[in-house]
Curated annotation (Swiss-Prot):
It catalyses: uridine(1939) in 23S rRNA + S-adenosyl-L-methionine = 5-methyluridine(1939) in 23S rRNA + S-adenosyl-L-homocysteine + H(+). The active site is at residue 406. Pfam families: TRAM, tRNA_U5-meth_tr. Catalyzes the formation of 5-methyl-uridine at position 1939 (m5U1939) in 23S rRNA. [4Fe-4S] cluster binds at residues 75, 81, 84, 163. GO terms for biological process: rRNA base methylation. S-adenosyl-L-methionine binds at residues 271, 300, 305, 321, 349, 370. It is an enzyme of class 2 (transferase). Keywords: 4Fe-4S, Iron, Iron-sulfur, Metal-binding, Methyltransferase, rRNA processing, S-adenosyl-L-methionine, Transferase. It comes from the Bacteria. The keyword Zinc does not apply. The gene is rlmD. This is 23S rRNA (uracil(1939)-C(5))-methyltransferase RlmD.
Amino acid sequence: MPVAGPLEIVSLDNEARGVGRLSNEDGTPGKVVFVEGALPGERVTYRSHRAKPSYEQATLVDILRQSASRVTPQCRFFGTCGGCSMQHLDSRAQIAIKQRVLEDDLWHLAKLRPDVVFRPIAGPDWGYRYRARLTVRHVAAKGGVLVGFHERKSSYVADMTSCEVLPPHVSALLVPLRELVGRLSIVQRMPQIEVAVGQDVTALVLRILEPLTSADEAELRAFADRHAVQFWLQPKGPDTVYPFYPLDRALTYTLPEFGITMPFKPTDFTQVNHQINRVLMSRALKLLDARPGDRLLDLFCGIGNFTLPMATRGCEVMGIEGSEALTTRALANAQHNGLDGKTTFACRNLFEVSADDIAALGRFDRWLVDPPREGALAVSKAVAELSQRGGEAAALLPGRIVYVSCNPATLARDAGLLVHEAGYRLAGAGVVNMFPHTSHVESIAVFERA
C-alpha cells in the first residue's frame, strides 16, 4: 500500500503499537490506525498492511515529530525479535504507560478508581529475565540451528546471537547452544530449550522427541562442564522432566529479608525477575499488615513463594494451589525452611471453587491472591455470594485482600465483583514492572472490607 499520513499518535495499545485515529471527510472520528514502532506524541507517516472497516494495522515509515521519550534500543535485534516490544521507549515512560493501562482497565471495565495509586515497583532494566523458553529450529537457509525467541508476530525463530534482557552468562550461551544442537543426532527433534537460573545453578531443560545417543550424552556432559550449566531432559509432558547432568546441584532462589531458601524444579512456576520478586514480597507483606497470631490464606500459592515469608511474621498460613505436584513441593519447602509448624497446604481447583468451598476453609484475617492471567473469577464470585448471604457467611470474609495480578483486565473484572457485589473498597493499586521493555503489565491491589 502507499505511504499515508501524517498521523498523530495518541497512545499505545496492549501490544505496544502506536494508536492514532483518522478523520472522516465531515470531520467526525474515523478509523483507528495501529502503527508498529510509533510512540505517543509523535507525528508519523505509515504504510498499512491490513485494512478493516474500523481499523488499520500499519508499519512506521517516517517520524515527522519525535517523542522526547524515544530512545535508541540497546539490543541490535530489537524490532525483529519478539522478546521485547518497548526498548525504543524510555524506561520511566514505559512504567507510566503501564500505570495508565492499569488505571484505564479498572475504570473502563469496573468503573473503579483506587483510593491510592501506589509508587511503581521497578528494578534493573537489563539482564533480569531469569526464566525463558527458547525455540530451537534447524534452518538450512540460515546455515544451521537457531536458538532464540520467535520473531515479532511470527512463528519463525529470530536469528539472534545475544539478548540484553537475559542474564549476561545466559546470553553468552546462545551461540554455543546453536553449535551444540547442530552436533546432536536429534538436531531435528529438539524443539525447545527452557532456561531457569537459580542462586548458584543455571538449568537448561531440553525438550527431546527422540532418545539421545551415547554420543549425544557425551556432548551434553562436556558442554555442561565447559559452561557450568545443568541439563534436564523432557521426553514428553512437563511431569516427565528429570535431571540429566550433573546430578549434584540443586536449583534454588533466596529471599534474604526473610531468611528463606526456595528449592524448585526448572519447570515450576517461579517469578521471571528475582529482584522484583523480593521487592514485591516486601510490599505485599506490608500491605497485608498482618499481626502475629493472625490466620492468613494464600490462594494460588505455587511452591510457597508468598506463603513462607508470611509465616515468618508469626502468622498461621494456609496455602492453596491447584497443582498436586506444586502443593507437595510447597510443603517440602516449608519443611526445608523450618516453617512446617506455621503452614498447611491443600490442593483445590480454584477456577471452580464455590462459596461453600470457601466457607469450609473457615475464617482468615487476611488473604493474598496471586492467580495466573485468567484471574480469580470463581474466588471473586464466591466472595460476593458469601457477602450477600450476610450473617455468619459474611463474617467469614477477611478484612483485607491483597491481589497480585499479571493481567490488568482480569484484575479489573474481579475487582468489580469484590467492590460492587462483595462490599469491599479498592484501597490502592499500582504497577509492578516485572517485565521491562515488554507491554506485560503486572500489578498489586488492596481491597478492604467496607
